[in-house]
Amino acid sequence: MAASVWFVLAILLVALTFDFINGFHDAANSIATVVSTRVLSPTAAVIWAAFWNFVAAFVFGTAIAKTIGKGLIDLSVVDSTVVLGGLLGAIIWDLVTWWLGLPTSSSHALIGGYAGAAVAKAGFSAIIASGWTKTLVFIVVAPVMGFTLALLLTVALSWALRRSLPRRVDKTFRVLQLVSAAAYSLGHGTNDAQKTMGIIVALLVSSQALMVNFPIQAFHLTDANHIPTWVILAAHAAIGLGTLSGGWRIVKTMGQRITKLTPFGGFAAETSGAITLFIASHFGIPVSTTHTITGAITGVGAANRISAVRWGVAQRIVWAWVLTIPASAGIGGLSYLLLRAVV
C-alpha cells in the first residue's frame, strides 16, 4: 500500500509538472503582443505575466476545475494509471508542438490525453457526453469570439481616435497595454491552472482507498466539488513559474508572424482575449487560451486590412488545433496501456 500511495503522490507531481509546462508552453499567449509591440522587454513581460497568473488564484472561482474533475470522465473509471496516462499524453504532445514552434492548445492536449487514457481502460462509456458538448463547441466559439471582439474594438477605437495625433495614441496605449496584458494573464492563469486542479482532484478522489491512512489530512478528499486551498495555490504557483521560464519559439509565431501589431492593436487583442476568457471561466468552460489570443490577434489584423493577416501561418496553426485532441488522446491511450503492462 505504501508504494501505491507514493505512486499517487508522484502522479500529483507530474500534474504540477504539466501545469509548469503549460505555463512554459503558453507563456507566449500572455506576452507575445506586449513583447512584439516593444511595450515590455521579454524578461519584464514574463515577470508581469507570471505575477498575474498567480494573482488569479485569489480572484476567480473553481468552476472549470469542477468541470474537468467530474464533468468529462466518469469518475468510477478513473484511477491513478488513467490520470498518469492522460498527463503523459498531454505533456508529450505539448513538448512536440513546442519544439516545432506550433501554438497548439495545452488545454485540449490535457482533456484529449485524459479522455484517451479513460477510453483505453473502459471504452467510450467512460465519456460523459453532456460535459463534452460545451467544451467542443467552444473550440470554435472561443477564437471566433476573440476575433469578433478584437475586430469590433479596433474599429470602434479607430473611429473614436481618428482625430488624435498618432504619437499621443501610441503613448497612451503603451500604458493601457500593461493593463490589458495583466487582464489577459489573469484569464490565462485562472482558465489553465483550473484544468490541472481538476485533474488533481480527480486523482485524489479516485485514490481515497489508498490515501485514507496517509498522515497528511489535506490529501484526504472524497468530494470532487471541493477544491482544497493548497491545490489552488499549488496549481497557480506552478503555472506562474512555468510562465517565468518563457517559450520564445512560440512568441515569434504569435506576436509577429500572424500580423504586425502596434500598442493600440496589442491592447485590442489582449482586452478581447481577456473578456473571452473571463466569460468562459465564469461558466466553467475549459477553453484554449491559445485559440483565444490567436483569434483576437487575427481580428486586429483583419480590422486594419485583410491582407495584413498572414493567413498561411494562421492555417498552419489551425491544423495544429485540429490534431491536438485526437493526437493527445492517442498518446494518452497508448501511455495507459503501457503503464498498465508495467505498473
Task: Go through each PLM region and give its residues.
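Multi-pass alpha-helical transmembrane bundle typical of ion/small-solute transporters
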Residues: 1-343
